[in-house]
Amino acid sequence: MSKVICSPGCYIQGNGELKKLAEYCAMAGAKKAYLLVDKFIYDTYKSEIESSFKTDCFKYTMEIFGGECSEHEIHKHQNALGQSDIVIGIGGGKTLDTAKAVSFYSNIPVIIVPTAAST
């Protein structure tokens, strides 16, 4: 029996995809990205993530996730969006849930980059 999954709209997996984040933002029609990343990702992959946006001269803001998906955390990142027109969540489940909520309540697209097999 065949199963069809219609979500997400686009699924990309592969080596070196972090280097293409700005390209994927542009494909979504975005001009400025708001990146929400967990501390481990920030400490480990910050330069790799930034290089994607610097190469394509794409505007972005990167913020570290506070650790809990809460109303306070969602509002904090909504208020920090500024002119960003896409949210990118990079990390584990709580980081991605917060990024999706910020996106939903701000009515802008989201890209999620799971870093754990469970998400």
Region spans (language model):
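Glycine/threonine-rich beta-strand-loop-alpha-helix active-site module
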Residues: 69-119
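ATP/NTP phosphate-donor binding region
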Residues: 1-86
